[in-house]
Amino acid sequence: MMTDSTCRLFSIAQPSHRTCVHSITRDDLRSSFVTGGEAATTAVPKWAQKTVTLPPQKRGCHLITPLLLKDIEVDLGQFSCGLAHFFLQHTSASLTINENYDSDVLEDVETFLNGTVPEGRRAPWKHTLEGPDDMPAHIKSSMFGCSVSVPITDGQLNLGTWQGIWICEHRDHASARKVVVTMTGT
């Protein structure tokens, strides 16, 4: 049973004109509120999480939206409104959102990264245990990051018309990569 103080605390997240009319129990995943004399029901957010294993990619940037959707579409369809968070579990590749149509953009970004972060004999890096592409891969990964978040609307990722999720592979000889996808919403 929800106490008055718990009810007030829970109501903070709701518009101020709503008043709690009954409590949430463990078996009851909904809380009713009165709005102008009518009862409204607010759903408690759902959660889903899945690890997607991507096949090894050659060095460069690659559009992976279709690969991700193939593995998460059933879970994604359970949400009418929410957020999908994509987290790459690696330090020598990165995730970003960018152009999904013209492959020249993929190549141009790779060209920019290679011109910005030196490799080989001209590079000043100490961390070269796994080869000359090792430390540059870590730096490039830090530049873009290892995660992106995308709104979920009506069971679909709400990306812009020309947006797609990319993996940027910064190693010459990469292995499979794992992306943890966490979805929450109603």
Task: Annotate the PLM regions.
Residues M2-T186:
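Active-site histidine-anchored catalytic micro-motif
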